[in-house]
Amino acid sequence: MMKIIIFLIVSSLVLIGVKTDNGYLLDKYTGCKVWCVINNESCNSECKIRRGNYGYCYFWKLACYCEGAPKSELWHYETNKCNGRM
C-alpha cells in the first residue's frame, strides 16, 4: 500500500512538471509578449494570476518572463501572431 502511495505522489509530480514551462507571458488579445520596462511586481502578479510560480521583467527583451506557468499562457516563437503590434 505504501508503494502505491509513493508511486502516485511521484507520478503526479512528474505530470505537473510536464504541464508547466518557463517563458514570456502571452497577451492573448494581441498575440504579443506582455511588455514591461522595469516593473517586476507587475510581472510577478501577472505570472501568479496565470498559475505561474514567479515572474519578472526581463529588461533586455522588455517583456515579462514567467517561471512555472502553463504552456498555454506563454508566448512561443513558432506560433507568434504578434506581427510587431503592441
Swiss-Prot record:
Q: Where is this site: Located on the interface between the toxin and the human BK channel?
A: K48, R50, R51
Q: Which GO terms describe its biological process?
A: defense response to bacterium
Give expression by tissue. Answer: Expressed by the venom gland.
First-listed, main subcellular location of the protein, grouped into a coarse class: secreted
Q: Where is the signal peptide?
A: 1-20
Q: Which UniProt keywords apply?
A: Antibiotic, Antimicrobial, Calcium-activated potassium channel impairing toxin, Disulfide bond, Ion channel impairing toxin, Neurotoxin, Potassium channel impairing toxin, Secreted, Signal, Toxin, Voltage-gated sodium channel impairing toxin
Name the protein family.
Belongs to the long (4 C-C) scorpion toxin superfamily. Sodium channel inhibitor family.
The protein in question is named MeuNaTxbeta-1
Organism of origin = Mesobuthus eupeus
